[in-house]
Amino acid sequence: GDGEYLVRVGTENRQHVMGHISLLGYGGRIIAPMTTGGSNESALGDPIEILLTEWARQCHKQGGLVILPHFPNPRLESAAAIVGGEIDGVEMTSWGDLYSGINPYSLSDWYRYLNCGYMVAAVGGTDKMTAMTAVGTVRTYAQMDKDQAFDYQAWMDAVRAGRTFATYGPLIEFAVDGRPMGSRIAMSATGGTVDVVWQAASVTVPMSRVELIVNGEIRESVAVDAANASGHWSLRVDKSAWLALLVRGHYPDRPEIVAAHSTPVMVDVEGSPFQAAADAVTILEQIEGAMAYLDT
């Protein structure tokens, strides 16, 4: 890098059923094998000799950042990796379709973990496989600490802290009681009211709506100017909740898309753990399915 732009090469290690995993910014020797357990990702008949969680632990040991790319597919081991605290972020993408925005399938599965209290940052990634999509179509923006130098380590620290949003164009600021994205706010058992402040601007995808997502549901929604908007809401919180900002937009003569999404702020109310029975059952079933696949 030259001080304004930094480029760092990482790897996407793969197992065609257990999942893919992006290992970024680590030092030392390359984390191998990069593929295992064929047939689509490795040699035909190749046994599974390493798991996603093992790749993730080695990356963390070598100082790197661990991302689940094109989340949630392939999905089998991602549940165990997230629950085990091995994942720093999940990648929102549209699988090559510039005009479809952040895929709702990615969002709904990410929401499942947030609903159970697992705070994992949102990141954006193009997953460019063809000439149909330009590099950087969907991006990650991470807010670094003001006292940190502009370097890759500072960027990784910001992603780990969840000070991120994924976007197809709109830039957003979002704070809950003055706390940035990725924060955790502790409340007494009586709950309380939080002040939500936001701002959004776009010179690419025209914006149409800004929404406040609370525990996976739309709590507030407002139509906005295509280029610039701001606002605030006061929200009563009686049980533990996560709050995030979602920006919708659309290109001319195209359907509305999810154009940007923040990492949430988690509000922990004393005596009210994050609970979502249906989501928890699905996560457990996925972990059990991964174990069954390995056993057979």
Per-region residue spans from a language model:
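Catalytic cores of extracellular degradative/oxidative enzymes
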Residues: 1-122, 126, 132
